[in-house]
């Protein structure tokens, strides 16, 4: 059984933790708010099913959840990455891969400066899921999958990089391809393009006096306009 430590409890942290736990991984969670979490996570899927994942340990202390992990996966905003890496580096076992679901907010640069050179690093070019929390610490929605994933791996031999990519493919049930350099993930930030175009689509016809009966959904009501 693969032992995965998820660091972070946002939308992606909820869905990734629940998804991996429901698919046979032993999942521990590092979060600032352990008291708000249930050990059972319910994740709804686009197919209409609900995944149930059991978290083995939930803690705000890295030494409780990191030492036993076979892989660490950060689900953190950019401003929090440095402090989380600083906390976990002293309890991280040698050679354990550390990765980030979001790589365009400085993960590789911070990890290379803080973690031992023997620590393999990996990061997604795009997030694997569209995720939304329903009830914090209890349930979330997996709203969409990627058809394939691109992964950057650094500080690893080609053989080890291929092994990490293969493990990610198995964990996320999605074809996974290696990028040539972490720069392909670090410098590819899609949100400034996606978010501004979506906001234009929502509001470009707005005029003073126009009101709305409901709050529009950002992703689920996406159009091709």
Q: Where are these predicted regions, by residue range?
A:
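NAD(P)+-binding Rossmann beta1-loop-alpha1 motif at the extreme N-terminus of oxidoreductases
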Residues: 1-47, 66
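Nucleotide donor/acceptor-binding cores
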Residues: 2, 147-149
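Short, well-ordered alpha-helix to beta-strand connector turns
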Residues: 24, 55-56, 69, 95
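N-terminal glycine-rich dinucleotide-binding loop that anchors FAD/FMN and/or NAD(P) in oxidoreductases
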Residues: 41-60
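Short acidic low-complexity segments
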Residues: 54-68, 177
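Rossmann-like NAD(P)(H) cofactor-binding subdomain of soluble oxidoreductases
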Residues: 73-74, 78-136
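Active-site-lining helix/loop region of Rossmann-like oxidoreductase modules
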Residues: 150-225
